Amino acid sequence: MTLLEDRPPGDVSGRVPLHYASLFGDLHHAQELVDRGDDLRTTDHAGQTPLHYAAQGCSVAVAALLLSKGVEIDAEDHDGNTPLWHATLRTRGEGPIVQLLLGHGADPHHKNHDGRSPARLAKALGGVDMAVRSAS
């Protein structure tokens, strides 16, 4: 089976090909999956959307594609973490993926179920002051 052939409902973690294309920054296949009508809001067993995976993989081009199609910028996974939270964990709140998400209105003060926000996480990791960055 190839990435674009008949798609099973998901792997053992509930991930579908669009999750993987998003994680690995495979814009070509992500675009094909979008064009074929794959559900852009599909979630895995942890409640993570393809945008969560694009954020984790720092896949700016795929994230931009998903955002251009109107996906929810602050979608929460089962722990209350948003794509910006995952991007912050990977980058300490720095880099193009964080800039893209903030530029599309991601909330740096959105608290997860543990009461931690991306801004607080960035500070704890020794990263940038996201509150200042989101205001600029």
Label the predicted regions.
Residues 1-35, 136:
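Intrinsically disordered, low-complexity regulatory segments in ankyrin-centric signaling systems
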